[in-house]
Each structure stands twice: as structure tokens, then as C-alpha cells.
């Protein structure tokens, strides 16, 4: 099964030698599930010719906001709507979670209570899953037809399921602790409050359920579809 990665942001260059870029992180996360991958850098205006150029699509995270004025965001939203119409499955992570929601009629805003960074606990339909986070934007209005499948006190709409069309999560299952640590030392400086980063640093060694989330993503992609 070919998964097309729609890359909407670039990892900091200083961290790429040790961690790779975002597509590398997702390939590492989903290793062992039988997928092959191809990446399109939509952040640089590179788009697939058709929603059928892959068997499923994965939209990455980004430092950009989905509500910002970038020339590649409207065509990405149109691509998402076309994939929905053609029943091509999509997974969205962080920015990907938000852009799918926005494209399908939801609302995304900068959250008044600020940032979620590092190991964060989520309630996935009664199951506690801890994943790394890095965001201050949130889906504040769920699109029609989407079901909330994960939540916590900070992020009410932490994961959404759109029947068999899309699975989206606000957290970053692809982020390893050392990458979060690197982000705090690079992009976090002067942007994320020191108290938030200090609390995140205290949880860097905590076990994550990234493999659990990888299994959920893989199972979603592999669901039988008419």
C-alpha cells in the first residue's frame, strides 16, 4: 500500500541530521506495517496530479497556521475535499488534523490557554494514551460528520474520525523525546513560555504509546473500503 506524504512543514535544519525530516519520522513510526511511501512537498507548492496517485494520504505537521495566507493552503484544502469525495483515506497529524477540519467546515483557532508541549495524556475512548505534543492552535469547532475520539482537559477535540475517510490527531506520535527536546532548544526559545518547557522537560523520559498510535493509523489505512 502506497502512502503519499503531504509535507506541510520542514523540521529545523539543526535537528535533521539526528532525526530526519518529517517524512522520515512518519516512515520510522509506521515501519513494519507493510507500507511504501512517496513525499510531495506541498509547503513548496508540489502537489500530486491526482488523489489516486497514492492509496492513502498522510498530512504532516507544520510551523504554519492553517488560517494563515499561504498560496499552497487553498489547493491543499481542495485536495482534501476531493480525496473525501473519492473515498481515498487520509490521516492528519497536528497541522494535518487542523487543515482537514478546516477544509471540511470546522474551525481552527489559536488557543487562549497557550501551548501543549511534550508528553501529554489523552483519553482515547476510555484508553489512556500518552503522546508528544507541540501546538497552540486547536480545532475549536468540529466539522459536520466528524466524531471526537480523543480528548483531554486542554484539548477537547484531540482526535477526530470521519467514518472511513479520515483519522486525525492533534498530537505528534512521530516525535521522539529527543526531537521535542531539540525543538524546545531551537524553535521554542522566545516562543513557548519557559514554564511550559520546564514542565515538558520533566516528562521527557516518560513512556509513550507512539507504537499504539502507529497501530491505529495502520489499521485505519488498511480498513476494507468499497
Model-derived features: where do they sit?
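N-terminal beta1-alpha1 cap of cysteine-dependent amidohydrolase-like domains
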Residues: 1-71, 75-78, 82-86, 194-226
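Amide-donor transfer/coupling interface in amidating biosynthetic enzymes
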Residues: 2-7, 25-29, 85, 123-226
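Conserved beta-strand termini and adjacent loop/short-helix elements that scaffold enzyme active sites
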Residues: 40-42, 111, 134, 151
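Short glycine-/acidic-enriched loop or helix-start segments at secondary-structure transitions
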Residues: 15-16, 49, 68-69, 101-103, ...
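Conserved beta-strand segments of alpha/beta enzyme cores
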Residues: 36-38, 107, 130, 147
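Cysteine-nucleophile active-site neighborhood
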Residues: 59-124, 130
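A short acidic, often aromatic-flanked loop/helix-cap motif at beta-alpha or helix-coil junctions
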Residues: 44-48, 116-119, 140, 156-157
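Short, glycine/charged-enriched secondary-structure capping and boundary segments
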Residues: 18-21, 52-54, 71-74, 105-108, ...
